[in-house]
Structures are given as structure tokens and as C-alpha cells.
Design a protein with these regions (language model features):
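Catalytic cores of carbohydrate-active enzymes across secretory and cytosolic contexts
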Residues: 1-351
Length: 351
């Protein structure tokens, strides 16, 4: 068949996105791709790199994801009862949904209530610096045409993304907008839910943080694809054969107490040594590719101690990820890393 294309309005022109479908198990994953000959050189790069470019490119990405995402679902004929906004990057889905309801003849007040009643927002970031804020000038450059379609003024739209409506100096925050247009908001653990209540407390003035509709849903993993092969073999040997089909049953997990400490430790060491081998290989290849001094490679890699406690930090190196927390108490850190009886090493890896 023909390539599906979604036309997403930007300024006074359209960005044309190819739609690709990837089958992930039984789930269809739809991807938007602006790198095609219908777009300008500047717009072809919108989908080149996640989190890439300046704030203008970031806004263009979020327009594509949010507004373009809803337009894609419409073109595919997919209509759902609930829309889940996973982090603030996709918050603009609710701008397009309000526009669609108003186009059908509803008032803005009716439209936003319908959107709120069918929207969930998951926040992942525990600090304000991790949320996207856009200056009014930049936001208006791309979103200036939407208030009339929503049946509201420009100031009304800006206020939906402000902690303090009416404050002309405050930037538009995608996360605040998501909170204001979603019936339910959740963090990704009990503690993160509490932190998020405090973080968003200023949105709902006159209420205590715990009175807000910010809750939590604890993050989980997909066991068959997340667990290492070595651990899956251990579980298969000691757990009930129906384990995979009843993973949420606490009784099934009690079988772990029947596994000897020696077997668990052996499995952990196998995994640890695989990690160390991988680090050595990758570090060596990268160092040589960058024309580093070969003699230094041996010196550096020999310092990796398989018998030391290895503490890993694997996250994107953004400021709010707080990789520097390790260095907040240097005296205590010095005591830990200089103890010859209990050696400790740290592995930092970015994305």
C-alpha cells in the first residue's frame, strides 16, 4: 500500500510525517518520521534525535508527538476511551482533543471537562528542572493559532500551563498543562507520589498537597524480556511452572527462600563478570577508536576489581538526574572507597 502521511500544522505551514508501524509482540507501535523530502531541511531533523537540539526543536518535537499523535490516531481510525500522557512531552494531545470537541459543536467548558475525564498523566521527574518550560514568545510562535480553535483567548491557554495564572512573566510548563487537563495524575512509586504532590501543590491553591489528585502507580517490569537468561534459568528450576502466568501472586515468590545463598551468589557473580567483560571490551574499542594511548588502556582496565562491590549509575546525563549526589559528602565517600577490607568501585554510564 501507499505510505501513510500525517500533516501536522506548524506556524503557517505543515510538517509532513511518515507513519511507521512496528509490531511489538501483540502491540502495534506507531512511529512518526519527519525525515522525508516533503519537509524543509530544518523540519526533516525534528525526529533525528530524542532530546536533541535547542528549545525550539524540542517544542517542535512535542507538537509532533502530542498534536501529531492525536492526528495519527484519527487517521488510523483508532478511538479510545482513555488517553494516557506518559510524561509532559506528550501533553499537547489535550490541545488537539479540545480542538476536536469544539469543532464538533461543544463549548470549551464542555470540551475540557470531557478531555479531563478521559485523561491520565504520569509524571516521572521528581525535580522542577526536569520539566519542560517554554517562553511565551517561542510558544506563541508555534501555538498562536490554537486558542481560537479551542474557543479561548491566548492568555487562557498560557494560564493552563502556569502555576500562577495571570503571571505574564511565567513560562508555559507542559507538566502543569498536563495536570490541569487530566483527571488523574500519578508518580511512579509511593514516595515519588508524595514528592509529586509537593512539587505540584501550587497548582491547586487552597488545598493541602495530600488533597490533590496526584497519586502513584509503582513501576514494574516485563519479566520475560527484562530478566537476564541466567536468572530465568534459576526461577525455572525452583519456581512453580505457572510462575510466568501468576507473577503478581506473593505466595509464588516465596519459593525464592528455597534457593540456597550459594546458588544466588554464583548467579550474581556470573552476571557481574559478564558486565565487567563487556565494559572492558567497549572501553577498549572506544579508546582505540578515539586514538587514545594504548598503554593507558591496560592501566585503567587493570584497576577493575571483580571482587569489589560494584555500584552502577546508568542514566541520561542531564543535570536533574543528579549523578553528582555521590559527591555530596566527600569525607564519608573517602572512608568508603579507601577501605582496603571492603573495596568499592563505581560504574557510570550515560545514554
Amino acid at each position: 500500500g501507499e505510505q501513510m502521511v500525517v500533516d501536522v500544522p506548524y506556524l503557517d505551514y505543515y510538517v509532513h510525517a511518515y507513519v511507521w508501524r512496528v509490531n511489538v509482540g501483540r502491540i502495534s507501535l506507531y512511529l512518526l518520521d519527519t525525515d522525508n523530502e516533503m519537509n524543509s531541511e530544518f523540519d526533516r531533523s525534528i525526529t533525528h534525535q530524542l532530546y536533541g537540539g535547542d528549545w525550539e526543536n524540542r517544542l517542535k518535537q512535542e507538537i509532533l508527538l502530542g498534536i501529531g499523535g492525536i492526528l495519527t490516531l484519527k487517521k488510523l481510525g483508532i478511538k479510545k476511551d482513555i488517553y494516557h500522557c506518559n510524561e509532559g512531552h506528550a501533553a499537547l494531545i489535550n490541545v488537539q482533543r479540545i480542538c476536536d470537541y469544539v469543532a464538533e459543536g461543544l463549548t470549551y467548558d464542555q470540551a475540557i471537562e470531557l478531555v479531563r475525564a478521559s485523561s491520565l498523566y504520569t509524571v516521572h521527574t521528581p525535580v522542577p528542572a526536569g520539566h519542560d518550560y517554554f517562553d511565551e514568545g517561542l510558544f506563541g510562535k508555534y501555538m498562536g493559532g490554537y486558542p481560537s480553535r479551542m474557543g479561548i483567548s491566548w492568555d487562557d491557554l498560557m494560564d493552563l500551563g502556569r502555576n500562577n495564572p495571570g503571571d505574564k512573566g511565567e513560562r508555559f510548563c507542559m507538566s502543569v498543562f498536563a495536570c490541569n487537563t487530566s483527571q488523574e495524575v500519578n508518580g511512579v512509586s509511593w514516595l515519588h507520589g508524595k514528592v509529586s504532590q509537593e512539587m505540584f501543590a501550587s497548582i491547586w491553591k487552597g488545598y493541602f498537597p495530600e488533597e490533590s489528585h496526584v497519586g502513584y502507580v509503582t513501576n514494574g517490569v516485563h519479566f520475560p524480556t527484562w530478566s537476564a537468561t541466567e536468572w530465568k534459568h534459576l526461577y525455572a528450576a525452583h519456581f512453580d511452572e505457572n510462575f510466568l502466568y501468576d507473577q503478581s501472586n506473593p505466595k509464588i515468590w516465596e519459593a525464592i527462600y528455597n534457593v540456597s545463598d550459594e546458588e544466588i551468589w554464583k548467579t550474581r557473580m556470573v552476571m557481574k563478570n559478564k558486565l565487567i567483560d563487556y565494559v572492558r571490551k567497549q572501553y577498549r574499542e572506544t579508546w582505540l577508536k578515539n586514538q587514545g594511548d594504548p598503554s593507558r588502556i591496560v592501566s585503567l582496565l587493570d584497576k577493575i576489581n571483580p571482587n569489589a562491590l560494584l555500584i552502577g549509575f546508568g542514566r541520561r546525563f542531564a543535570t536533574y538526574k543528579r549523578a553528582h549526589l555521590l559527591f555530596t559528602d566527600l569525607d564519608r565517600l573517602a572512608k568508603i572507597v579507601n577501605n582496603p577490607d571492603y573495596p568499592v568501585q563505581f560504574l557510570f554510564t550515560g545514554k
